[in-house]
Amino acid sequence: MSVLVGSVVTLGMFWVVPTGLALLDGPRPPGWDLLRRSWPLFAVPGGLALWLPRSGLSTALAAVYALATLALALQAPARLFLTRSLRPGEVAVLTALVAPSVAGLALVAERAAHPLLGFDLDILALTVPHFHFAGFAAALVAGLLCRASDGPTARFAALSVPAGTLLVLLGYFVDDWAELAGAIVLTAGMTAVAFLTLRERRETATDRVTRGLLAVSALVLFATMLLALSWALGEATGLPHLDLTWTAATHGLGNALGFTVCALLAHRRLRSRRPTPPAPPAPAQNPPRTAHPRTELPT
């Protein structure tokens, strides 16, 4: 695994996933808080697996991290059972919970030098950051934006980002044209995320730092998704395009640092400045009954 890919995945394991999980509201299934708090501990073996040579040891360390991603994926049906909701914003959140498990499985196969389902090791290596950032972070941000503004654009973003990510994955099994279709859907969804982010910058953010973070995350997203679309189009049609290494260095690094990090920092700042809802008033108590003298006439 290259230094660039390893560095990006390390960021995803140690910071992106726990930071994103801390931004989620709603019901907490059993084990949620324990898993969220202990995530950095599971990221340690995963991070070590990235930097060690391919071996039985690195495979075992990757498997420990993969088990944590599987535990996170199991939180999705548990959350669905509690919410009983498939609203677009909730679909995006459920997708975010499941996506790291795909990355975990790909990491185990890549560290074991096993061409899982026929994919070569380079594709498996790039699958790991893809499902930490496009699968988890982008879906999570789309879900957060949909909860903040449940309009048509927000609902489109919350559905098309998970759908595009899934279609890109299915394209690996079909052909380059199917992967291009997934890239088009994902680019449309991420473009909607960028527009919503700029609107949130204008309407919600009040301080300069948060506004700057939102602006950077949105503007970077426009550029990086065009690079991804260009690569998918070139692979399908044979038109000139950046090779996989340069696409990872531009689209991948830009999405990781320019979009994901800035967007999560901005949403964390927005969350910390969100006014705390007032406590519900205490229920009114019936006044105690006072004793009244008997008024009956004696018999």
Give the location of each predicted region:
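Hydrophobic alpha-helical transmembrane segments of multi-pass integral membrane proteins
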Residues: 1-281, 289, 294-299
